[in-house]
């Protein structure tokens, strides 16, 4: 079986509904076959344990980034993790091989009132001058 690494990028997972539900379903389905990394618990004293995070990535066959969409982007906590962990020489560069051949899955949640999910937006996003 493939080794699956799930990165939870929610900055406050205990107060989440959708993200917590997704992660609970993944845990129940895959059990011990996954390595679940909850970034809100791993970000201690303003930093990540970069070698430990890189080791988890290197050992995985499949990497899942699970997060809520905030302002059309990932939460700041996940952005910080990406910036810290995906270093030159590890994640990119001519000598970087740690992530080669791995599969990436993005699992993103978004929330808005029901009336926002329709064909036409409730307001114009662009203006012609």
Residue ranges and their predicted role:
Residues 51-129:
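Helix-loop-strand module that forms the ligand-binding subsite of alpha/beta enzymes
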Residues 43-51:
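Structural motif
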Residues 4, 34-35, 112-116:
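Short, basic/glycine-rich phosphate-binding loops at helix/coil junctions
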Residues 17-21, 48, 76-80:
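Generic recognition of short, well-ordered alpha-helical segments
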Residues 1-33:
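N-terminal beta1-alpha1 ligand-phosphate binding loop
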Residues 11-14, 41-44, 122-123:
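Short histidine/acidic/glycine/proline-rich micro-motifs that form metal-
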Residues 32-44:
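A short beta-strand-loop structural module common to alpha/beta enzyme folds
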Residues 5-7, 35-37, 105-107:
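Hydrophobic/aromatic beta-strand patches that form the interior of the parallel beta-sheet core
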């Amino acid at each position: 079986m493939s080794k699956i690494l799930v990165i939870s990028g929610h900055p406050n997972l205990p107060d989440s509904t959708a993200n917590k539900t997704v992660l609970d379903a993944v845990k129940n389905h895959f059990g011990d076959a996954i390595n679940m990394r909850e970034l809100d618990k791993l970000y201690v004293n303003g930093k990540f344990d970069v070698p430990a995070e890189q080791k988890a990535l290197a050992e995985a066959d499949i990497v899942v980034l699970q997060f809520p969409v905030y302002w059309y982007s990932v939460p700041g906590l996940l952005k910080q993790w990406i910036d810290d962990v995906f270093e030159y020489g590890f994640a990119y560069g001519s000598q970087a091989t740690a992530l080669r051949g791995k599969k990436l899955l993005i699992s993103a949640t978004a929330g808005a009132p029901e009336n926002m999910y329709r064909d036409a937006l409730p307001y114009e996003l662009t203006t012609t001058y």
